[in-house]
Amino acid sequence: MTQTNGFDALHAHAQRLRGAAIPALLAAEPQRPTQYARQVGPLYFNFARQKYDRAALDALFAIARERDLAGAFQRLFRGEQVNVTEQRAALHTALRGDLTDAPVASEAYATAAEVRQRMGALIQQLEATEVTDIVSVGIGGSDLGPRLVADALRPVSGARFRVHFVSNVDGAAMQRTLATLDPARTAGILISKTFGTQETLLNGSILHAWLGGSERLYAVSANPERAAKAFDIAPGRVLPMWDWVGGRYSLWSAVGFPIALAIGFERFEQLLEGAAQFDAHVLNTPLEENVAVLHGLTAVWNRNLLGSATHAVMTYDQRLALLPSYLQQLVMESLGKRVKLDGSAVDSDTVSVWWGGAGTDVQHSFFQALHQGTSVVPADFIGTVHNDDPYAENHVALMANVLAQTEALANGQDSSDPHRSYPGGRPSTVILLDALTPQALGGLISMYEHSVYVQSVMWGINAFDQFGVELGKQLASQLLPALKGEAADVADPVTRELLSKLRG
């Protein structure tokens, strides 16, 4: 990005604005609270407290045009091979809508719709049984997305199925889950793109034995034959996924089977509709008015021009408590790259460390550091305008904290006592959902997906591979024999010492 024609001008704006007070930016642009706000369907975004002005934004958009961001979105939606290292498309958008005239994308949409029909039929079959509980086994993209959506949208009472998620290879996770369940009234779903994932195979074996066989086991995989063979699952209970959908972008596919069981098939389809609505906004809206573009460019500005190494996400709705964990994978696995598409080294820092939690709990843990620490941490504050619970006073208090915390972070407060002085200057974006509906959540997740893609285009990296996760898995596989007491050649001296400790 630093090699673009417009970078020097952008850098000059950063030098000018780095020490600017956010109240001064608001005073200089009186219409800023509304001019820096956007509404897309049930989602409202306010960027007014970010540390840029119109001139800096114009420079950011100039680089986005130089990087052909609009063309990059066309290539993504049309099913071109944007995942160049694996020579694949990234057609997660086709799982939820048919927005182009590209045959590849239209065929993918039709294929996904057919699989959803099969999934709906399997749900109807399960509803006709005595099964009350579902254990969903997967990890990473096969777990974080479904777990987030199921937790956010599950009904308070009256759900047909209780869905339990197990991801960690630690046997304690499976033990605690199964201890509360009756095998005669439980079904299992094994989700793995390759069906070679260690965690899913080990946990799947435990679940298979506990259920007494495969009669109530289902699978979702891009390798359905291997899935069926590994656990003797009938082919009719195996749903496909595809190599043109990355795991962290797959909750819209049959990977969403546990979502549909937890919240109902109709509401699962509404989730997809909300995502498709936001996709249409991204595809058809000019860059300057495009929320995902503005969100992604803001992340680039904070990372590369203002030097922020981390980004916090605070969800002021307890039902969205898992969103920061989901976004950690979406953002950091997608953007944690050190080489560009052509294999050359990047010319700027890439991904920030994403972290966060649910408000107001986080105000009593890490907000001290946000307000008075030496690091400036940009943040997203996410809340809901209307709540579904009967405790209106609690919701008013919750939203008062969103308003207060974002104001305090931005404006600060002087004091003659340095221990009680707040420097301010901490930028944040406020995102408000009209209500936490499937459509709104679908749109919110879609926005973050596209924001990630914007950042990848600006940096010239591939957002759709994840080779960085492989080496550790390979080494773990090689070390298994040594941990079991078998002879093994372990070259690393520290690993040898740790092995001796573990083997007693």
Swiss-Prot record:
This protein's name? Glucose-6-phosphate isomerase
PROSITE patterns, A to Z: P_GLUCOSE_ISOMERASE_1, P_GLUCOSE_ISOMERASE_2, P_GLUCOSE_ISOMERASE_3
**Which reactions does this protein catalyse?**
alpha-D-glucose 6-phosphate = beta-D-fructose 6-phosphate
Which pathway features in its UniProt record? Answer: Carbohydrate biosynthesis; gluconeogenesis; Carbohydrate degradation; glycolysis; D-glyceraldehyde 3-phosphate and glycerone phosphate from D-glucose: step 2/4
Main function: Catalyzes the reversible isomerization of glucose-6-phosphate to fructose-6-phosphate.
Q: Which HAMAP family match?
A: G6P_isomerase (MF_00473)
Q: Where in the cell is it found?
A: Cytoplasm
GO MF, one term, reads: monosaccharide binding
EC number(s)? Answer: 5.3.1.9
Alphabetical GO biological process terms: gluconeogenesis; glucose 6-phosphate metabolic process; glycolytic process
Major localisation: cytoplasm
